[in-house]
Amino acid sequence: MKQLRRIGLLVAFIVVVLFSSCTKSGVEPRSQSFLMLGTVCRITIYDKPSDAAFKAAFERIKEIEEHMSIHMDESEISRVNRSAGKEAVPVSEDTFLVVQKALEIARLSGGAFDPTVGPLVEAWGIGGESPRRPSDEEIAHLLTLVGYDRVILDEEEQTIFLSDTGMVLDLGAIAKGYAADEAARVLTEHGVGSAIVNLGGNVLTVGLKVDGSLWRIGIQDPEQER
């Protein structure tokens, strides 16, 4: 809970500091926030805010969470992980597409991005209440369970199979981006032309600011203190 409170404060700070100039046009923006995908998800609409647009966008984010969250026992990704080394699991078009894209990025990056780092994420307790540093021996063992080339996709059957028992798919590094893309698409379909989708710091803008100018998005310097 402490981590979520810190995330909430950070998101609020980002929204106030980066986007306060958007209200200068005289249009009153509306925002809604929910805890989804393990973080604070906030949508701000500047031109045509409507309850229907907010509802549809957050429902789409929730749908993606229910498919891809590693923290939900009955999510598709959790079922894929439980079936590692045993059998292929049929999944939705959303999940198949995101895993397919994750593997493509893994290949292009030479493994710098790897969606099968789940065992290491779990061992380090990243995102949890009690993070720790595993021993070198534990890390060496868990690395044997990491390898994007051992994820087998069947496009015809739309299934995912992890070849070795103990492998864990973790889409945390890509699912929020996909959810932001989908939320923006839904907002556009509802006639929204100016909005910000902020999923725990994964920021996506829709259209231009209401005064026609470009958005300015601040990026934290990784070498400086926050």
Predicted feature descriptions by range:
Residues 2-226:
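Mature catalytic core of soluble alpha/beta enzymes
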